[in-house]
Amino acid sequence: MMKKALLIDDECWLRVQARDASADGRFVFAVRTTGVFCRPSCRSKRALRKNVRFFANAQQALDAGFRPCKRCQPDNARAQQRRLDKIACACRLLEQETPVTLAFLAQAVAMSPFHLHRLFKASTGMTPKGWQQAWRARRLREALAKGEPITAAIYRAGFPDSSSYYRHADQTLGMTAKQFRKGGDNVSVRYALTDWVYGRCLVAESERGICAILPGDSDDALLAELHTLFPSARHEPADALFQQRVRQVVAAINTRDVLLSLPLDIQGTAFQQQVWQALCAIPCGETVSYQQLAATIGKPTAVRAVASACGANKLAMVIPCHRVVRRDGALSGYRWGVRRKAQLLKREAQKEE
C-alpha cells in the first residue's frame, strides 16, 4: 500500500534530526528527561524520539513547565531574526556582479566562515558558492537573451575570466552560449518512439545524453511535446546506436527501480536541479508530500515552487516526480496524468510488499 503523508509531529522530528535552521521560529521541541526546550537547529545531542514533545512556540513550552536551552536560546526571537537578517544580507552580497569570497562574506555579516556556511545552507538549501553561481548563470542567460556579445555577457555576469565560464556555465545553459543566444539553433536532438509497459513513450537524446523521457498515449501528442520542449533544435530520427540506448531506457522504465546508467542531459535552474536531486533520493515504494519535499531541501515555505519544479521534469520515471503526493496522500498534479501516476505507484507498492 502507498504510505500516507506523515503527521505534523513526524515532519517536525525530521527537521529536528536535520537541525533545519529554516524551521527555527516555526516550532520548538522539548525533552522530557531534561526539562529543556530548544530550537530545531540546536547543536545539542539529540534525545530519543519517545522523549521529545513539540510546541508551536516558546511560550507553550514554558507553560508546560520546560525551561529554555542556554545554548540556542529558543525564547529569544530577536536573536533568531538577527541571524535571518544576516543570511538575507549575505544573499544580497552574493547576488552582486562582483564575486565575493566566503571570508569576505563572513566578515561583512560578523560571523565565522564555518558558522556562516552552515547556517546559510540550513536556511536556503544551498551553499554560498552555489547561490553565487546560480545568480551568475542567471545574469548570463539574461545578457545573452538581450543579444549582448558573448564575451561582454560573460564578464557582465560576474565570471572572472572566460575559462571560468567554460568550466561552469555550460552545465546551466545546456548548450554553448552562441546556441543559447540563437534559441537552441543547430542543437541536434535525436528521438525514438516506442512501446513501454503503460503505453507509448518518446525518448530523446542531445549531444550530452538522454534529455527527455516522455510517456503518452499517441505519437502525435508526444512529437508535439518534444517540439514544445526543444522548439529551435533539429529533431532527427534515431540511428542504430541510439536505438540500442533507447532499448536500455525502456528496459529500465519497465522495471520497478528504474536504474539507468546512461549519461543524462539534465537542464534546469539551480533550484529545479536541487528539487530533482531530492526526488531521486525518495526510495522506491515510498511517497512524500510536497511540504515534506520542500522541507527536505531546506525551503519549507517554497511548496508552490517545488511543485512547479516537479512539473518541469522532462525525465519521467528516472527523476521520480510521481512519488510526490498531497499532504493527505491523494494523487494530483502529475505532468503525464494522474492515471499514469497511480499506475506507477501501484506497481512500486505491490513489488515492495
UniProtKB/Swiss-Prot annotation:
DNA-binding region: 103-124, 150-173
PANTHER family: BIFUNCTIONAL TRANSCRIPTIONAL ACTIVATOR_DNA REPAIR ENZYME ADA (PTHR10815:SF14), METHYLATED-DNA--PROTEIN-CYSTEINE METHYLTRANSFERASE (PTHR10815)
Any Pfam family the entry gives: DNA_binding_1
E.C. numbers: 2.1.1.63
Species whose genome carries this gene: Salmonella typhimurium (strain LT2 / SGSC1412 / ATCC 700720)
Chain's gene name: ada
Note accompanying the cofactor annotation: Binds 1 zinc ion per subunit.
Keyword DNA repair: yes
Sites annotated Cleavage: P128, K129, K178, Q179
CDD domains: ATase
The protein's name: Regulatory protein ada
Sites where the protein binds DNA: T34, R43, R67
Binding site for Zn(2+): C38, C42, C69, C72
Reactions this protein catalyses: a 6-O-methyl-2'-deoxyguanosine in DNA + L-cysteinyl-[protein] = S-methyl-L-cysteinyl-[protein] + a 2'-deoxyguanosine in DNA; a 4-O-methyl-thymidine in DNA + L-cysteinyl-[protein] = a thymidine in DNA + S-methyl-L-cysteinyl-[protein]
